[in-house]
């Protein structure tokens, strides 16, 4: 994962840290040699008087060489340390970019059903956090590599004097490692178990202080309710976290105390050996320094290892997310989408219910959408109209029956090509905090640089009138999320969304409640243009307003997940069935 982010930086980081790892023991060994040389020179029977005499005598040449070597190593250590910090910051930034891009790409490949599943949302939330929260783990891994080499070099020096010193030091620190691993696992289990509550807590914090909800929070006085609910969840999490940390504090303090006793036992042995003359002052300096550094390094390694093991538990959430595979994908021998579509789209006894739901969203659904025809779907909320659109665009696959495009199952076609052939605008379209041009260009993002195409799509949707009023025109940032942004009315946003569908220039055009936020005149103009511009295309229109669907070639009445009746407006009114009943109910509001 790190290598994939930046091979060059990763290799440079490893080499720099390997060089830096052997510098401490080298400097300490040279320090020992300097002390021994000073003691030797001080014990000479005849010694030069002044510094210049020492220099001229040549007796201090070796000492001068040692001091110069130590100075060189000190300067090299400082320089390499700065290079390591520089490379580490760059590598971490590259890893953030690499992981974030990979997460976005993988999320785009997953099924819509995954995003509508609460369990998946918990996993996605944990994965998002790991792309940022665990990035320091890279630096810790590299530091562990460096410290491991340094420990090996110091350990080799201690073993040369007495192997038991290293063994004693390692045994003293093992209980600390075990204890740290235990508490890391406890904290991870707590965070994993409370992921749904954390998502709710973050959601409450977001809606309590965001522009989208600010009006209702103020008007309905929701601040106290949201604040108290947030505090309740946060305090619950805090209480459990505090209990675990209290236990960790007590246990780890005891284990660390035991390790300290072992350390000072070994230190007393070194002093005793020096007093008996078995070790020189230089040896004492080297051994005490090595033992002190080695104790700190091993303790740091064990702590870092336990910390990394704890963080690796969290990274497992990221890997699990990447392991998820979509159920909806292109077959190995995928067919190209016919150009043009000749016969149309047929629903044959289609049944579907959403994951985890007992009620069928659509059942025994059969109808034919002929090529070049405009069909309107009408019906009450929950009848299954939007589900039909999701099935048509293969956001879901039917559990029963099949959907045919020119006589072949939709599942036989290349998925990307199929979705490129269908332009859909849902009633809950996205309001992108981008420029007006980019809001339209998202309909066919590969043509983002084609400003003429964007202008043409805007004109078709009457969005050009909206954009003409903006100070910066097509380059104006829309939405209030960023400083330069200007918010739009619901109807203005809707025109931008409709322009997005025209930008796609797809063979099949689907508008799901496209004019819900438009006034009657604007709606009439949009549908007139839609009728004119959809000539030669296959179009599916969903609307609650019966005045809007009259222009369709055919109207299908959807109820309880199946087509109850179909025909032209006049035919359906004449039959005095469900369509006539709904039409009359709506018409009463205008009388």
Protein language model regions, located:
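ABC-type nucleotide-binding domain
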Residues: 330, 335-591
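Juxtamembrane helix-loop junctions of ABC transporter transmembrane domains
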Residues: 27-31, 73-116, 120, 183-188, ...
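Pre-NBD coupling/linker segments of ABC/ABC-like ATPases
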Residues: 138-141, 208-225, 244, 322-340, ...
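Cytosolic ends of transmembrane helices, especially the final helix of ABC transmembrane type-1 domains
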Residues: 222, 246, 266, 287-323
């Amino acid at each position: 994962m790190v290598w994939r982010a930046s091979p060059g930086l990763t290799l440079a980081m490893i080499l720099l840290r390997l060089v830096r790892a052997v510098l401490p023991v080298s400097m300490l060994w040279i320090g020992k040699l300097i002390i021994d040389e000073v003691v030797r020179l001080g014990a000479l029977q005849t010694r030069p008087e002044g510094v210049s005499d020492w220099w001229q005598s040549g007796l201090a040449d070796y000492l001068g060489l040692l001091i110069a070597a130590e100075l060189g190593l000190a300067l090299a250590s400082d320089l390499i340390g700065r290079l390591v910090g520089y490379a580490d910051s760059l590598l971490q930034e590259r890893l953030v970019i690499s992981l974030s891009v990979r997460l976005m790409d993988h999320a785009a490949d997953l099924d819509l059903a995954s995003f509508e599943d609460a369990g998946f949302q918990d996993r996605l939330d944990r994965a998002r956090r790991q792309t940022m929260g665990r990035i320091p783990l890279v630096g810790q891994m590299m530091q562990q590599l460096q410290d491991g080499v340094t420990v090996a070099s110091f350990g080799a020096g201690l073993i040369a004097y007495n192997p038991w010193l290293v063994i004693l030091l390692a045994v003293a620190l093992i209980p600390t490692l075990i204890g740290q691993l235990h508490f890391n696992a406890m904290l991870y289990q707590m965070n994993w178990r409370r992921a749904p509550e954390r998502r709710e807590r973050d959601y409450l914090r977001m809606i309590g202080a965001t522009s989208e909800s600010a009006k209702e929070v103020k008007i309905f006085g929701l601040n106290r309710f949201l604040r108290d609910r947030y505090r309740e969840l946060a305090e619950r999490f805090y209480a459990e976290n505090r209990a675990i940390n209290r236990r960790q504090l007590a246990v780890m303090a005891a284990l660390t105390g035991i390790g300290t006793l072992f350390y000072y036992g070994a230190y007393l042995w070194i002093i005793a050996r020096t007093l008996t003359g078995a070790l020189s002052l230089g040896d004492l300096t080297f051994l005490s320094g090595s033992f002190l550094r080695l104790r700190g390094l091993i303790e740091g390694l064990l702590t870092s290892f336990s910390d990394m093991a704890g963080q690796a538990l969290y990274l497992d959430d990221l890997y699990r997310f990447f392991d998820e595979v979509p159920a909806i994908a292109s077959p190995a021998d995928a067919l190209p989408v016919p150009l043009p579509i000749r016969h149309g789209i047929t629903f044959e006894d289609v049944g579907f219910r959403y994951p985890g739901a007992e009620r069928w969203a659509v059942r025994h659904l059969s109808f034919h959408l002929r090529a070049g025809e405009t069909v309107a779907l009408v019906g009450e909320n929950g009848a299954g109209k939007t589900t039909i659109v999701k099935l048509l665009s293969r956001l879901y696959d039917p559990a029963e029956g099949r959907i045919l495009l020119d006589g072949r199952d939709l599942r036989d076609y290349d998925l990307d090509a199929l979705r490129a052939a269908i332009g859909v605008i849902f009633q809950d379209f996205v309001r992108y905090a981008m420029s007006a041009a980019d809001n339209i260009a998202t309909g066919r993002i590969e043509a983002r640089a084609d400003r003429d195409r964007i202008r043409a799509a805007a004109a078709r949707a009457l969005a050009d009138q909206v954009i003409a009023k903006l100070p910066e025109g097509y380059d104006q940032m829309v939405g209030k999320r960023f400083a330069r942004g200007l918010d739009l009315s619901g109807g203005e946003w809707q025109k931008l969304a409709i322009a997005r569908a025209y930008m796609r220039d797809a063979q099949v055009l689907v508008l799901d409640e496209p004019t819900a936020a438009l006034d009657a005149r604007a709606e009439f103009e949009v549908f007139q243009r839609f009728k004119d511009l959809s000539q030669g295309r296959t179009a599916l229109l969903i609307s609650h307003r019966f005045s809007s669907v009259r222009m369709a070639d055919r109207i299908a009445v959807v109820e309880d997940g199946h087509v109850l009746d179909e025909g032209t407006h006049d035919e359906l009114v004449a039959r005095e069935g469900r369509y006539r009943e709904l039409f009359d109910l709506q018409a009463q509001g205008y009388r």
